[in-house]
A protein has these predicted regions:
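Short beta->alpha linker loops
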Residues: 19, 45-48, 90-94, 115, ...
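N-terminal helical cap/lid subdomain that shapes the substrate entry/recognition surface
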Residues: 2-93
């Protein structure tokens, strides 16, 4: 029985991958004078905290100041690109109805995101997330988390629910693997990357959806 739900955000509740790719591309050109390859994107960028991405691009030579500066700059680019594309600046279809359904069932839920605080604040304000969940319970990349596994575990603690009783909703291969390694055995995947057959074979995955209307 599901007692708590943990949502990834980017690519799960909000389809924004193109904006992240565009923003990281700008940073990559600054740091390396080259674009990001598709292989790099899947292996080193998707679902990975900013500090690890910047270390990767700086060959593990990044200082604390480098990480802070380029992380904030990347997210500034990202927010700018989101605002410029108003047509797609909304939550995935069915999201608010699913939030309501969870509320009605008295199932607590939160977000565990690799985004930094400035982005979380941006999402909370833009999508009125405070109407649905405790904003203080949202887990984000504050620089202390080693990986998404630690984020998921902390999110379960915030909900006061054993992670084995949590449903985690993810969209990336690395996110699914991290959810499973964190101890979750009920994982739903939002198929924003159009990889359904691969996701269905992964440990812990119980369902692959295109949007949240499929869970109503």
């Amino acid at each position: 029985m599901v007692k708590g739900v943990i949502f990834d955000f980017n690519g799960t509740l909000f389809f924004d991958n193109d904006k992240h790719v565009k923003a990281w591309g700008a940073i990559s050109r600054l740091l390396r004078n080259k674009d990001i390859t598709d292989e790099e994107l899947h292996k080193h960028f998707n679902g990975v905290p900013n500090q690890k991405i910047i270390q990767y691009m700086k060959n593990n030579q990044a200082t604390k100041e480098d990480i802070e500066y380029y992380s904030k700059l990347k997210e500034k680019y990202y927010r700018q690109f989101c605002k410029e594309d108003q047509a797609s600046f909304h939550l995935v279809e069915g999201s608010y109805d699913y939030f309501k359904q969870l509320k009605d069932q008295k199932i607590s839920f939160t977000i565990a995101s690799a985004s930094i605080k400035e982005n979380i604040d941006f999402f909370v304000e833009s999508f009125q997330l405070g109407k649905w969940m405790k904003v203080d319970d949202i887990i984000y990349d504050n620089g202390t988390y080693q990986n998404k596994i630690a984020m998921f575990k902390d999110a379960a603690l915030k909900l006061n629910v054993n992670i084995k009783d949590c449903l985690i909703i993810e969209d990336s291969k690395s996110g699914i693997e991290n959810a499973y390694q964190a101890g979750c055995r009920q994982i739903i995947v939002v198929n924003s990357a159009n990889n359904k057959k691969e996701y269905e074979k992964m440990p812990g995955v119980i369902k692959v959806i295109n949007d949240f209307k499929e869970l109503l």
